[in-house]
């Protein structure tokens, strides 16, 4: 037998020291025998202690196997030393397991409480099904939280001080938030001291107040909770008139019991911020307001504020302070696309403040696979396919006049399924296809010169590519090289006129949606080799990594993605069987998508762009214009 690695094999061969000893020299002892008086002491004359052989091992299976065996013992009622009586149901368990998992049980079984000496313990004020689920979790580390059990699980987890389950229940409820239930979730969170859930439910309620005020939950609010909501500076409303109307709807739901609360509630409506016409004609003439002296005083205060502008500096207070909702004043345009078997020219505008879609002037050409971007407060529609031909023409929309112009220079190549974005005052057209081949060409438009010029091509041909601008770079994301969908990503540096690869997405995607939101690049939907996708992920440029987020509610290929007033909207697309006109919005705090209405038209491969709301009403079309446009499409 030879020496083990690290030994020198000196002296007497295998045993070392020339004595035919009983084993090999161990690695790390420098080949010197440590037995007998003849052991080497080294150059210092001091005996060097041996380095013992070691193999460290931590079992990954052990915790799972142990828990599984303990759970089997429980189910067979073996070695159980306590029975929990919950609502007449008896649950067998082991004190040590319960104490290790729950501070509540630890205090019960290790202290001087009477229960520490009992073999059967009655637990009150807890649902027996919830208790059984929680005991199962203690033994299996697994639990399913769903709509049917969360309202009993969360109180039970709070009582037993199972913090992990509390957090899971709160996370589940965050994902369920919508305008019809957020007030109930808010109250539930408040009752059970779930501060983070309460904060998020509050924020959701404030941001979506215009929809929340229409819900039945709003009409059923206790007066204290109503006041908590309407006194917030963060209430997202178009005008204070909405707050007054919401309060009066709540009051008139049960006038007999609630009219006594009108002065308390009305003092939190910022009457001085109302228009004079509404203050006098609606508030001042309301019989319930006029019949209460305190309410009349509030109306008089508001009148004085409006009539005496020179005195306003002396009249400042909570009721004169404007509310501060998150970013406002942006609208979303959905442009062209494919609908009912043909390309379309129709364009519509979405205002999140009214949650309403309205038709605006159509383009002069039908365009599917069109690239859309906003430059200098004008909306550009680049290329596309009109149902017969690939296009290089461009149209430009002015929201102030509600008109499209065709005086923009065409691109050097015809392009459909093209990515379009704005960087440093230039409009970039990236990739696409020209009817002959998939393109890696990139060109940019100078609005001052009305001229396109080519820049460095991408390293990969890409049609159905998504583009985004972040940190001074232009990103080209996914698409197809003409053969298969791509997950690769590259970015363009205009200072060096060069494309460089960055980390790929986790999923191959063509015809995906892409937008920059909170310093991340979001990529959603699209199509892989097999099917349309609902999955979504986001890119962090600081770490050069992609991470998944929750999937959309629908599969969407050819989807538009845009950020409007601080919210991320996914618009239209194709789910594999139908063209979509539905819209969904993503909340990064809850990591949740929710449906929020529909366009007038179904759109696959349409473009989206975001602009400041126009200052005039010229962009609003009458019903007859809508019908004419529908006929033209």
From Swiss-Prot:
The keyword NAD does not apply. Residues 26-45 have a biased composition (Low complexity). Residues 7-25 have a biased composition (Gly residues). Pathway: Protein modification; protein ubiquitination. Residues 182-284 form the BACK domain. Residues 1-62 are annotated as: Disordered. Gene3D superfamilies: 1.25.40.420, Kelch-type beta propeller, Potassium Channel Kv1.1, Chain A. One of its GO terms (biological process) is protein ubiquitination. InterPro entries: BACK, BTB-kelch_protein, BTB/POZ_dom, Gal_Oxase/kelch_b-propeller, Kelch-typ_b-propeller, Kelch_1, SKP1/BTB/POZ_sf. The keyword Repeat applies. Keywords: Actin-binding, Kelch repeat, Repeat, Ubl conjugation pathway. Kelch repeats lie at residues 331-377, 379-425, 426-472, 474-519, 521-566, 567-613. One of its GO terms (molecular function) is actin binding. It comes from the Eukaryota. Probable substrate-specific adapter of an E3 ubiquitin-protein ligase complex which mediates the ubiquitination and subsequent proteasomal degradation of target proteins. May have a role in synapse differentiation and growth. This is Kelch-like protein diablo. It comes from Drosophila ananassae (Fruit fly). The gene is dbo.
